[in-house]
Amino acid sequence: MDFHGTTILGVKRNGKTVICGDGQVTMGETIFKGNAKKVRRLGEGKVISGFAGSVADALALYERFEGKYKSSHGNLMKAAVELTKEWRMDKALRRLEALLLVADKENIFLISGNGEVMEPQEDAIAIGSGGPYAYAAAMALLRNTDLDAEEIAQKAIKIAGEICIYTNDNITMEIIE
């Protein structure tokens, strides 16, 4: 049975960085769980993150990312690059199916097993099945309102949940200021 769907969104505005996610886990055509937590703090609370994909794979990657973050003395970009290199080169890790968003006060990165570490051009980035909807909503709100990052993230996930059947509005959020 396949587990599907998630929406994870990162937003930066006015010195505040937010990563939030919905709570829905879908198995086949059934909502399996509505209050899953796909967002967490890492690096002694200095990094916020969210994942899309396999939970077990994401947890394994979080553990490795924390090690890279510590060994890079809190350099988020270096930790992201080092994790990606290891992910690509290790035969067991290569099979892991997850995407990670990681952020600190200044940066948000998307980390993938394809060897990418991407920093968004804009002040928003999203992953998962509802990601395109949340991203579009966040960009519209960033460009046309004075809402703060937290409000933008909440509204964007809520909009994604109204469009994507694999996304709900049970939001988990982590904030760094």
Curated annotation (Swiss-Prot):
Give the main localization category: cytoplasm
For this chain, one GO molecular function annotation is: threonine-type endopeptidase activity
Give the location in the cell.
Answer: Cytoplasm
Keywords for this entry?
Answer: Allosteric enzyme, Cytoplasm, Hydrolase, Metal-binding, Protease, Sodium, Threonine protease
UniProt EC number: 3.4.25.2
Q: Please give the superkingdom of this protein's source.
A: Bacteria
Q: Which PANTHER family match?
A: ATP-DEPENDENT PROTEASE SUBUNIT HSLV (PTHR32194:SF0), METALLOPROTEASE TLDD (PTHR32194)
Instruction: Tell me which family the UniProt entry assigns to this protein.
Output: Belongs to the peptidase T1B family. HslV subfamily.
**What is the name listed in the Swiss-Prot or TrEMBL entry for this protein?**
ATP-dependent protease subunit HslV
